[in-house]
Curated annotation (Swiss-Prot):
HAMAP family: HSV_GB. A motif (Golgi targeting) lies at residues 925-928. Residues 794-847, 823-843 are annotated as: Hydrophobic membrane proximal region. Residues 96-118, 505-516 have a biased composition (Low complexity). One of its GO terms (cellular component) is membrane. This is Envelope glycoprotein B. Disulfide bonds join C140-C647, C157-C603, C231-C296, C389-C437, C668-C708. A motif (Internalization motif) lies at residues 965-968. InterPro entries: Glycoprot_B_PH1, Glycoprot_B_PH2, Glycoprot_B_PH2_sf, Glycoprotein_B_ecto_C, Herpes_Glycoprot_B. Glycans are attached at N165, N275, N380, N423, N497, N514, N515, N560, N727, N749. The chain crosses the membrane at residues 850-870.
Length: 980
């Protein structure tokens, strides 16, 4: 300690004098005998005390003041020598005061050795500091130039492009035609039914039944059906190479009228010659009886055929294995036909007959007839290209936008929220089969839309273009231009004198699409060479080759070859992919537009900010480079480059001193002084004194000073909070929430995606899907179930209540007569209903089995009664007296005689002759009356005047003839006499 004091109090201190005059009482100095700590400001000042004493005062003060200063310094140094040694670095307090420290000077520093005692001055300095509770602090060494960087030069900003070649127009979308080709056909056949019945003694049974259909000959169709509306009862058919004949009812051939069927399906009409099936049963039992029924049937049904139209089906269930477009013309001979040539017949100018109205058609047609083993089919022939089409119209689009993107066209249709993608090359309709209808329908639909909506505002800029989109949709598109844009084009053409190029300017894609395919060369395209004398051999060869090419083309059907090479367009059953494509394109366009605008704006802003960075780095290179690298660095400009060093994070404690005044009374620190340790748990000897920089940066030196000013107020960021100094003295901590924030950021205003609803669309309706098959099975099933009811015993199946119809007619008649007539009609209908009900009841009773038995018994009883009546009548005719008056018989006479005591052998001489004569007269009179009644009835029946006159005369004669009949007495005189 003495040596330290002597070294300090040597010649070095002899010339020292203070810089600021008298020391202030609140300034604390810590003279230390030992070597000062590294980085200590007091130690550095004491170490340079000799220099301070040797340096003359700038104000040129007298030597007497210097001597006083030297004496005061010696006293201070002498006092410090007698103090015990203390650590050079103060230990941090256990607690961080928020204001001026009020701790006792008797606190013992735990970092001191047991033999050491704390320095009160150092404890005062230490306890007057503020510990940083949170936040990261960094210390940055000065850059030396070992690491240099430069600022990137300006970039080229991208330019955003919405698309290329946007074109608006009208379009018609076609889809695959899955519906069959439908037409009407007539079916002619004779239904033959051969029945075999066994006749027993008391029963009849059906032992066999043969049913077959045979075709009607074409000659019979011409001569009878379509000429007279009749059909023959004879049927000829070939079975097992044998010609068979059948006759209706097993009788001779006759012509029968064709009558409408009583029961027909909605999609067909039918006519036949009979409704009943003949079943003959003879009178002789124990035999088989065979009968034949021939029913001539004509049906008008619906026929269907699907691509490639090599056959067609009828609603009767029959399939004809020939194309409906087959014919004898040149273009129709190539169609498919599986039947022999003699089975087919085509008639030009044919006029069929309507079997309902019995009238022939006014316009002649071309009729085809095909005879199959069971039926003859006829239909009207039409050209294939006119009737059949493999594509059908799906949607008419009145607003469509086409844009070119990455070598493809995108057709956007907002009305159905769909986007279709196709190649930029137009689709040739000739490459697909049977597409002649597309161009016609597309042109008509586009012209109709244009006249309704765009005729006054737009003009067409090209012809109809065809594109095959993904999914099998054919788009017929015709581009348009608004009138204003068309005028601009015309003005540009007139200005550049290119009026001949108007079409190419309005539609620049027309030439590209039309010239994309190279025309194939052929010998047919070479003109026929003319032989010359100079090159006869060469010309002959060319002539021969040309002729072979023509013959090959003529011999091989061009349509058939083309049909093999053509490919049918297949369309998907859903357009969900197109709707998703529309949604994706919509989102993609919006997002890409926003991102591209952001990228362009960001790049432009970066280029502008780069200039600002380049200028600001000259002012504060460390802050600029740290913000650029997003890392704490220390920087220094070295010409056109920047030298940097990386900052180290302070892991130890940082203490902020509560005073910003330096030892000079006129000089103060511009940033607060701090004391810190690099690592944690460091002792007092490892503490470093520095100065607080910006953004929690710690300087290892205290070089930031300024002249002291009055009413000074400063806020400094210390950790995560701010500290407030007033007049270079710490006042309090300030939370960040008490300080209002001003934002330097530019808000990015982005537009949200607009709502887009997906519309449910059906490419094929349920009716179309149900109608795709070759056969309508519901129609076939209905027809087959009703076939028997349609032609056989229809009267026993279809019961029509004629009584109800008659009653309804009578009721309508009486109802038209007014209220009185309606009342009378009610009574009449009630009575008639009772009668009808009675008759219906009797009929129902007769149809009942018990009723039939009762009727049989009644018939037998009637026969017995008739037999006895017949015997009685015969008895009257043979012996009327005996029959009418049995008392006159011989038995009665004998009985009477016996009663009077006479024998049977006695004669009848005692019989009363008068009574007998009266009886004879009575019988005679009765016979005359009977004859007279018969004569009168005949006269009345014949309405003959002569007979009536004769009858009246006979009546007069009978009235005047003879005495009148007198009644016999009840008692016999003989009996009376006997009783007396």
């Amino acid at each position: 300690m003495s040596s330290g004091c002597r070294s300090v109090g040597g010649s070095t201190w002899g010339n020292w004098r203070g810089d600021g005059g008298d020391l202030r009482q609140r300034r604390v100095l810590s003279p230390v005998c030992s070597a000062p700590a590294a980085g200590s400001w007091i130690g550095s000042q004491l170490g340079n005390v000799g220099n301070l004493l040797a340096t003359p005062h700038p104000l040129g003060k007298p030597a007497s003041s210097r001597v006083g200063t030297i004496v005061l310094a010696c006293l201070l140094l002498f006092g410090s020598c007698v103090v015990r040694a203390v650590p050079t670095t103060p230990s941090p307090p256990t607690s961080t005061p928020t204001s001026m420290s009020t701790h006792s000077h008797g606190t013992v520093d735990p970092t001191l050795l047991p033999t050491e005692t704390p320095d009160p001055l150092r404890l005062a300095v230490r306890e007057s500091g503020i510990l940083a509770e949170d936040g990261d602090f960094y210390t940055c060494p000065p850059p030396t130039g070992s690491t240099v960087v430069r600022i990137e030069p300006p970039r080229t900003c991208p330019k955003f492009d919405l698309g290329r070649n946007f074109t608006e127009g009208i379009a018609v979308i076609f889809k695959e035609n899955i519906a069959p080709y439908k037409f009407r056909a007539n079916v002619y056949y004779k239904d033959i039914v051969v029945t075999r019945v066994w006749k027993g003694y008391s029963h009849t049974s059906l032992s066999d039944r043969y049913n077959d259909r045979v075709p009607v000959s074409v000659e019979e169709i011409f001569g009878l059906i379509d000429s007279k509306g009749k059909c023959s009862s004879k049927a000829e058919y070939l079975r097992d190479n044998i010609m068979h004949h059948a006759y209706h009812d097993d009788e001779d051939e006759v012509e029968l009228d064709l009558v409408p069927s009583k029961f027909a399906t909605p999609g067909a009409r039918a006519w036949q010659t009979t409704n009943d099936t003949t079943s003959y049963v003879g009178w002789m039992p124990w035999r088989h009886y065979t009968s034949t029924s021939v029913n001539c049937i004509v049906e008008e049904v619906e026929a269907r055929s699907v691509y490639p139209y090599d056959s067609f089906a009828l609603s009767t269930g029959d399939i004809v294995y020939a194309s409906p477009f087959y014919g004898l013309r040149a273009a129709a001979r190539i169609e498919h036909n599986s039947y022999a040539q003699d089975s087919f017949r085509q008639v030009e100018g044919y006029r069929p007959r309507d079997l309902d109205s019995k009238l022939q058609a006014e316009e002649p047609v071309t009729k085809n007839f095909i005879t199959t083993p069971h039926v003859t089919v006829s239909w009207n022939w039409t050209e294939k290209k006119v009737e059949a089409c493999t594509l059908t119209k799906w949607k008419e689009v009145d607003e469509l936008v086409r844009d070119e993107f990455r070598g493809s066209y995108r057709f956007t249709i907002r009305s159905i929220s769909s986007t279709f993608i196709s190649n930029t090359t137009q689709f040739k309709l000739e490459s697909a089969p049977l597409t002649e209808c597309v161009s016609k329908e597309a042109k008509e639909a586009i012209d109709s839309i244009y006249k309704k909506q765009y005729e006054s505002t737009h003009v067409f800029s090209g012809d109809v273009e065809y594109y095959l989109a993904r999914g099998g949709f054919l788009i017929a598109f015709r581009p348009m231009l608004s009138n204003e844009l068309a005028r601009l084009y015309l003005n540009e053409l007139v200005r550049s004198n290119r009026t001949y190029d108007l079409k190419n300017l309005l539609n620049p894609n027309a030439n590209n699409n039309n010239n994309t395919t190279r025309r194939r060369r052929s010998l047919l395209s070479v003109p026929e060479p003319q032989p010359t004398q100079d090159g006869v051999h060469r010309e002959q060869i060319l002539h021969r080759l040309h002729k072979r090419a023509v013959e090959a083309t003529a011999g091989t059907d061009s349509s058939n070859v083309t049909a093999k090479q053509l490919e049918l367009i297949k369309t998907t059953s859903s357009i969900e992919f197109a709707m998703l494509q529309f949604a994706y394109d919509h989102i993609q366009s919006h997002v890409n537009e926003m991102l591209s605008r952001i990228a362009t704006a960001w790049c432009t802003l970066q280029n502008k900010e780069r200039t600002l960075w380049n200028e600001m780095v000259k002012i504060n290179p460390s802050a600029i480079v740290s913000a650029t690298l997003d890392e704490r660095v220390a920087a220094r400009v070295l010409g056109d480059v920047i030298a940097i060093t990386h900052c180290a994070k302070i892991e130890g404690n940082v203490y902020l001193q509560n005073s910003m005044r330096s030892m000079d009374s006129n000089t103060c620190y511009s940033r607060p002084p701090v004391t810190f340790t690099i690592t944690k748990n460091a002792n007092n000897r490892g503490s470093i004194e520095g100065q607080l920089g910006e953004e929690n940066e710690i300087f290892t030196e205290r070089k930031l000073i300024e002249p002291c000013a009055l009413n000074q107020k400063r806020y400094f960021k210390f950790g995560k909070e701010y500290v407030y100094y007033e007049n270079y003295t710490f006042v309090r901590k300030v939370p960040p929430t008490e300080i209002e924030v001003i934002s330097t950021y530019v808000e990015l205003n982005l537009t949200l995606l607009e709502d887009r609803e997906f519309l449910p669309l059906e490419v094929y309706t349920r009716a179309e899907l149900e109608d795709t098959g070759l056969l309508d099975y519901s129609e076939i099933q209905r027809r087959n179930q009703l076939h028997a009811l349609r032609f056989y015993d229809i009267d026993s199946v279809v019961n029509v209540d004629n009584t109800a119809v008659i009653m309804q007619g009578i009721a309508s008649f009486f109802k038209g007569l007014g209220k009185v007539g309606e009342a009378v009609g009610t009574l009449v209908l009630a009575a008639a209903g009772a009668v009808v009900s009675t008759v219906s009841g009797i009929a129902s009773f007769l149809n009942n089995p018990f009723g039939g038995l009762a009727i049989g018994l009644l018939v037998i009883a009637g026969l017995v009664a008739a037999f006895f009546a017949y015997r009685y009548v015969m008895q009257i005719r043979s012996n009327p007296m005996k029959a009418l008056y049995p008392i006159t018989t011989k038995a009665l006479k004998n009985k009477a005689k016996t009663s009077y005591g006479q024998n049977e052998e006695d004669d009848g001489s005692d019989f009363d002759e008068a009574k007998l004569e009266e009886a004879r007269e009575m019988i005679k009179y009765m016979s005359m009356v009977s004859a007279l009644e018969k004569q009168e009835k005949k006269a009345i029946k014949k309405n003959s005047g002569v007979g009536l006159i004769a009858s009246n005369v006979s009546k007069l004669a009978l009235r005047r003839r003879g005495p009148k009949y007198t009644r016999l007495q009840q008692n016999d005189t003989m009996e009376n006499e006997k009783m007396v």
